Amino acid sequence: MTKLNELAPREGSTKGRMRVGRGPGSGKGKTAGRGVKGQKARSGVAINGFEGGQMPLHMRMPKRGFNNPFRLEFAEVNLWRLEQAVEAGKIKKGAELDAAALIAAGVIRRELDGVKLLAKGEIKTALKLTVYSATEAAIKAVEAAGGSVTVTKKAKAQAEA
């Protein structure tokens, strides 16, 4: 019977590692297959995106968009996540929840610019939520379960609708 410590590849099926820079007799001595001098002969990797002086692709492409310094980022909470926290005993049924309570319950990690309630999943427990914004479907689902949603400040998408 073959033992695990006696396993070895078949004779001739693998090639040994080429040791470069070990004299002219090895066939890979002196410059070790790197050619002569220059940037690519040196140690380290070639510069990413460098195309030998030709204008690189990333600089030929047009610039687009900008970073809005006033952009708002929300901590998103889905209905299934709230239901999961209730089942785990982290949130009591009928509890009043705001951003601080959601952080304490471990539903979100941080508030960012506000909490946004989204409608993914189902909710069966009545909860009183106070959030920065919420989708219409999420509000309907919470109210259908016997809870309520208080939106403190409407998001842009809801204000336009």
Curated annotation (Swiss-Prot):
Q: For this UniProt record, give its keywords in alphabetical order, as a comma-separated list.
A: Ribonucleoprotein, Ribosomal protein, RNA-binding, rRNA-binding
Q: Name one GO molecular function term.
A: rRNA binding
Q: Where is this region: Disordered?
A: 1-39
Q: Where is it found, in Gene Ontology cellular component terms?
A: cytosolic large ribosomal subunit
Q: Which Gene3D superfamilies match?
A: 3.100.10.10
Compositional bias, Gly residues, is annotated for 22-36
Give the GO biological process terms. translation
Signal peptide span per the entry? none
> Is Coiled coil among the key words of this record?
no
Q: Which Pfam families match?
A: Ribosomal_L27A
Determine the domain of life of the protein's source. Bacteria
Is rRNA-binding tagged as a keyword?
yes
Q: NCBIfam families from the xrefs?
A: rplO_bact
Functional note: Binds to the 23S rRNA.
Its quaternary organisation is: Part of the 50S ribosomal subunit.
Q: Which family does it belong to?
A: Belongs to the universal ribosomal protein uL15 family.
- This chain belongs to which protein, by name? Large ribosomal subunit protein uL15
Q: Which organism is it from?
A: Caulobacter vibrioides (strain NA1000 / CB15N)
Gene of this entry: rplO
